[in-house]
Amino acid sequence: MYYCISFTHKNTDIALREKLSFSNEAKKSEFLKIISTHENIEECLVISTCNRVEIVAFVKMACAEFIVKSLALLCDVDKDILLEKADIFEDSGAIHHLFSVASSLDSLVVGETQIAGQLKDAFAFAVKNNFCGVHLSRAVHSAFKCAAKVRNETQISKNSISVASVAVAKAKELADLTQKKAVVIGAGEMGELVAKHLIAAGAKVIILNRDLQKAKDLCERLGVLSEYDSLENLKKYLNQYEFFFSATNAPNAIITNSLIEELSYKRYFFDIAVPRDIDINENENISVFAVDDLEIVVQKNLALREQEARMAYGIIGRETSEFFRYLNDLALMPIIKAIRLQAKEYADKQLEIALKKGYLKKSDKEEARKLIHQVFKAFLHTPTVNLKHLQGKMQSDTVINAMRYVFDLQNNLEGLNQYKCEFDMENNDEIY
């Protein structure tokens, strides 16, 4: 069954989320290796963003305690606290949750579009490292399909906002950004989003990054209203400008009290990284805003999009039901094919016996074959129709198992394509 353990802005604070975050691929790989050793876990992947850590798996039976214990040991967190905080979803609940995440209905900023790319990256990593198989491939592929439907059939992502845009909107409430210089620390996806929103607000941006070439490349994309420098010169910039937006993947804080000098004017720090980049004391001239502090702006966004969200949840509910109908169809179609194949094999075998014993002339072989095939097709028509009527119904599994036993189809099914998955697990072909 499908299984999901979720830690988000809804059930954990930023301090706990930053402990749980997978800031590098090595940590993610280590965790997935640990949990994939469990006998009940067949496939798994991890989605880790500034607002969530999601463990999505395909399992034989529930195993939340093992997964949470493994996460607690790796991240040095109390297991009981995690079990108390975790939202756990099983089977249809897990698929509904995954579809909601992919469609940005479960995001801190409803309608933001970053999560689709983050899910894509999480899936690609799991496939590349052999943690993900056909079951999660189906689920993620369907999640992308659902997200596309939500985007196309609702206005949920129209004028969509992100954590980056919310941070800049908050800065605009504090001061006029026109012609001001704002420092953006980090040249990754989030840093680029912040820079674009700042430029749109009339500001000029300075990109600081450890990899100078990456900062230069970003500035070339941004245009004349940007400049760049090395992160080594961070202290100089911290004590020269008013607005700072930090979005790095650093494992520990990079802006600390030791870098801050007392100045006569106000400075505003926006920390949109998890783990947090900023660990400084606030005073009358220094204000720090972390991801969770942007909740007020987010709530305004939710109110504006409430009607669209209801429509989107309707789509997600229907797509969840459709997904499980699809799974039932995959199970039924091989049964129908196997029965027809078995009938054809028996008919051909008896035809050859009849020819050998002289019951039938060789010249009549093809006509006899056509007649026999028409007979077994007519005979199997009603069973085939009845099986197809079971598609998507609860009793389908019971009937499938009975048919497999009655017709001894276990071996016959091995050669058939039971999955019809558009993702080739051997060649790592993309489905997104």
UniProtKB/Swiss-Prot annotation:
It comes from the Bacteria. NADP(+) binds at G186, A187, G188, E189, M190, G191. It catalyses: (S)-4-amino-5-oxopentanoate + tRNA(Glu) + NADP(+) = L-glutamyl-tRNA(Glu) + NADPH + H(+). The active site is at C50 (nucleophile). Pathway: Porphyrin-containing compound metabolism; protoporphyrin-IX biosynthesis; 5-aminolevulinate from L-glutamyl-tRNA(Glu): step 1/2. One of its GO terms (molecular function) is NADP binding. The record marks H97 as: Important for activity. Gene3D superfamilies: Glutamyl-tRNA reductase, N-terminal domain, NAD(P)-binding Rossmann-like Domain. Its EC number is 1.2.1.70. Keywords: NADP, Oxidoreductase, Porphyrin biosynthesis. GO terms for biological process: protoporphyrinogen IX biosynthetic process from glutamate. InterPro entries: 4pyrrol_synth_GluRdtase (IPR000343), 4pyrrol_synth_GluRdtase_dimer (IPR015896), 4pyrrol_synth_GluRdtase_N (IPR015895), GluRdtase_CS (IPR018214), GluRdtase_dimer_dom_sf (IPR036453), GluRdtase_N_sf (IPR036343), NAD(P)-bd_dom_sf (IPR036291), Shikm_DH/Glu-tRNA_Rdtase (IPR006151). Substrate binds at T49, C50, N51, R52, S107, E112, T113, Q114, Q118. The keyword NADP applies. Possesses an unusual extended V-shaped dimeric structure with each monomer consisting of three distinct domains arranged along a curved 'spinal' alpha-helix. The N-terminal catalytic domain specifically recognizes the glutamate moiety of the substrate. The second domain is the NADPH-binding domain, and the third C-terminal domain is responsible for dimerization. During catalysis, the active site Cys acts as a nucleophile attacking the alpha-carbonyl group of tRNA-bound glutamate with the formation of a thioester intermediate between enzyme and glutamate, and the concomitant release of tRNA(Glu). The thioester intermediate is finally reduced by direct hydride transfer from NADPH, to form the product GSA. Belongs to the glutamyl-tRNA reductase family. Catalyzes the NADPH-dependent reduction of glutamyl-tRNA(Glu) to glutamate 1-semialdehyde (GSA). Homodimer. This is Glutamyl-tRNA reductase. It comes from Campylobacter jejuni (strain RM1221).
